From Swiss-Prot:
Described function: Endonuclease that specifically degrades the RNA of RNA-DNA hybrids.
Family: Belongs to the RNase H family.
InterPro entries for this protein: RNase_H, RNaseH-like_sf, RNaseH_domain, RNaseH_sf, RNaseHI
Origin species: Cereibacter sphaeroides (strain ATCC 17025 / ATH 2.4.3)
Gene from which this protein is expressed: rnhA
GO cellular component: cytoplasm
Protein name: Ribonuclease H
Cofactor(s) the protein requires to work: Mg(2+)
Cofactor note (record): Binds 1 Mg(2+) ion per subunit. May bind a second metal ion at a regulatory site, or after substrate binding.
EC number, UniProt record: 3.1.26.4
Gene Ontology molecular function terms on file: magnesium ion binding; nucleic acid binding; RNA-DNA hybrid ribonuclease activity
Amino acid sequence: MSDLFAYTDGACSGNPGPGGWGVLMLAREGEAVVKERTLQGGEALTTNNRMELMAAISALEALTRPTEITIVTDSAYVKNGVTTWIHGWKRNGWKTADRKPVKNAELWERLDAAQQRHKVVWRWIKGHAGHAENERADELARAGMAPFKTR
């Protein structure tokens, strides 16, 4: 049985501006990578946080059956949101503690739904700190953004 990891990243040129997301999915047996899959996409007008969310959503939605997966993100916004803040938001009808609407609520709801059928471990790592897999996810996010950038 292999262990599945999804390294996710979002990128934005301007905030808001054109943006992209990328996912590097790796199945590992020990240290050996036995399968690799990449995903990427983008939007013409978006934010970095929306692209970080889309990367995580896309990783989970790409899974065809219930799976144990570790999602590795450099976004504290995604990690804290999905592991901590979301519980209060759901209790409060997708409002923050000070009763304001949650930003990107439709994406948080989609992420919440996407993770329900899986056993997900969420891991945060520092971005641009020499993690090869995170750098690959960043390259994919930039490639996803490229068609939407004007020179």
